[in-house]
Amino acid sequence: MTEKGLETIMVEYLRNHNGYEQGQSADFDREYTLDPGRVERFIRSTQPDKVEQTMCFGPESQRRNFFRRLSDKIAADGITNVLRKGFRFNGLLFDLYYPIPSELNPSAIDFYQRNIFSVTRQLHHSAENTLDALDVCIFINGFPIITAELKNHYTGQTVKNAIKQYQDDRPATDPLFAPRRCAVHFAVDDEQIMMCSELKGKDSWFLPFNKGVNGGAGNPWRESKILTEYLWQEVLTKDSLADILENYAQVIEKEEEGKPKPVKRVIWPRYHQLDCVRKLLFETRSNPIGQRFLIQHSAGSGKSNTITWLAYQLVTLVEDDENIVDSVIVVTDRVNLDKQIRNNINAFKRLANIVAWAEDSASLKEALQGGKKIIITTIHKFQFILDTIGGSLGNMNFAIIIDEAHSSQNGAMSADMNIVVSGNSENEEEDIEDHILKIIKGRKMAPNVNYYAFTATPKNKTLEMFGTPVQHPDGQTGHIPFHEYTMKQAIEEGFIMDVLRNYTPYKSYYKIIKSIEADPEFDKNQASKKMRGFVERQPQTIKEKSLIIVNHFLDKVIGAHKVGGQARAMVVTSSIIRAIEFYYAITKQLEEMHSPYKAIVAFSGEKEYCGKMVTEAIINGFPSSEIEKKIEKDPYRILVVANKFQTGYDQPLLHTMYVDKQLSDVKAVQTLSRLNRCHPKKKDTFILDFANDPEDIQRAFQTYYKGTSLSHETDPNKLNDLIEIVEDANIYTDEDVLEFNKLYWTSAPREDLDAIINRCVARFKDELSEEQQIKCKSAIKSYVRTYPFLAAVMPFISPEWEKLYHFYYYLGTKLPKLAIDDWTEGLIESIDFDKYRIVEQEEVNLSLSDSNAEIDPVPVTIGGGKSEPQMESLSKIIENFNTLYGGIEWEHADTVRAQIQQLPALLAKSESFVNAVHNSDSDTAQLQCNTDLFQIVINMMAENTEFARNYLDNETFRNFVNSRVFQQARAIV
């Protein structure tokens, strides 16, 4: 099959099965970049009175004026906006397209059917190069909407050749390929489809428009079928294309630094976004309200746009002339999602001013009463809103869209949300039992709400609460996402970067010494952890790591012109104090190296530092709200963070991450995934990790690389196990629980509740051993943590469990804090910091296996009991610590130290090294350094063989010395 053969199949299908007209290249007017004959035919067919009043198609001068103004309007506003909003000429508004009717209105159906869909092969589009022809162009009412270049494997050409053709031979100076003139450009072969919404020559960025196969890139294999035929058989049907133009495609405006006017960008949905929203809308329309959907879409996959399109279309869904949902509530941690949704929806014509931002109860009430259809709120404000507005909404239907569901749903908050939207609010005339039953029902998913939970990293609670139930052969019920766009597919399609491809761990080596004559004993396990923390917070440690960070960033990132010279870096620290220390150390290093670049520190709240209370704004010298914009422009290049910007932060310029914080599971994936956003000039990423084992990072990513499912549901009877543990302690009676709940549900004074709780606390203190106290309190805490979640998902209700929940909750807050014996008291005062060094390990590609992950449900267990200390003498603890973390133990340490200190000066005398520094790049100079140092060390063997032997035999040590001496010697030549 030739390229023309694929073209024939596509065009013939559109004509014979989708009702397209066959256009001719001669129909196309190159001056106006449209098909004037079909434009005129459509307008005369639908608006003859306006044609007569304006005389827009005659005389000829008027006709030319009409088409010239129309063409200019499309060039300025974009074809999608002009089709939606129409075109004014001589005081009248001309409709250029009629949307899909939302109800059975014969007139609306008739006008929609008058839209003219046409397809033209071999379109000679260029006035300058009249022989050049585009393979396929799709028109609606005479306006070009879609272009396509087709290739075929059988002729030795693929989608890559089609992309190259667009980049080389389809310049934006040609009106047909100018920005916003067409909605999208497709590069197609018989196996893959790529799309580009704005051509920019060599910088044209094509994204995949494939279905995906087995959780990865590509399209499902179909014997004797063209793998890409879904484009013309499914996507380009009249109703489907009309739906995309009306509800997805848009031109949005975004302000960019240094540009006087907002930059207009064309948005076209990718296949997984289109597929996801359409399937969700179908299920919403086909089933009664009260459904739950979990959408597992990879970080960086465009969840914000998917949420926007879903929210907008949910409020327009109609059944029997009534809205299926009255309002959509979007719960998010990202404040900027409000502006994004508002801007996106403003691009649509049919609904205007429908989005509200609710940050307190008053604004939420105002939004609901004012008919706002989409209400956005953050998780931090949602609790207050739900507690305040009462339960008068039970007669309304809601859709609740949860952005990053794992962080936005806990049992107690879910219960309050369900109570409010279901109308299960407090009623003073109810008896206690009735009210408890309503609270339990409120914990369950409200019957008048559909939940749409989006996340890239679903936890077990999220899967069980929102996932689709599936029956396993063993009778257990698991849960799976309703829709998936996996990390694997996103990486393979080139939509996000593989952040684990260039991962370099660093290993720290420390040595500490005893600072007292005595040799006391401490718990060796507690001591080792405490000593490592002591070393890690030493100024020398921060200085060494900061030097590595700055040198690497300047040499390997800035020096290598990463992201076209625009690369940014993030330093992830373990605490606010550590972030501040790193910020000042990095700032000092940059200044000493006379670098033009600066760092920014980011943390929440205020913190005492050097005797003063400081905030990020005080340290940075500008408001916190400006951090995201500041880091995008020079001189700011390095962002130092403490538990901030580690989730939901979308910055394509971010190229390198320096990690000095232990990360695990979801936190590891979320944090490192900040690097995965693509940029046309971003070819790779880099992670330099001071704190984590590469295998732990690899294991965390593997869980969310492909599909993630829940193995089986949580067994509610595990709660009975916890209750039995608490009851065995005999610190309360059944009468205590009943009396407490009676008082609690009748809003009795706090002192009446305390009288009951205090009796139980007294028994806890007086009658239980320390081991029993630990076991009892752990069971109470586990019950309080687990019950709200289980109550939301279990198929039955238990008033007794609900009563115990409230009783345990208050009891748990009053129980004394159990002291964890500190068997290291006085340790820090007994030691001193002696040596610290940090060594680069081998760079690795943390590849992931092609397999789905299955995770277990929420564990319903208590913590471990009291552990016995393992006492050892301080000298032995120090010996073991230095052996574990100290690397080489030197016999003649002072001599070795003196030899190492000589090396920079000796190296600086080498002409070959000096020439390399002044005339070569950093990598070449480092290689010359390594060569010259090798000879210098050989020459030093006569003095002391210990240093030379370790340098020659220990590659890790040799690399450390080479790197450090290179930096020091370069600074003096």
Could you tell me what each predicted segment is?
Residues 532-641:
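Conserved C-terminal RecA-like helicase domain
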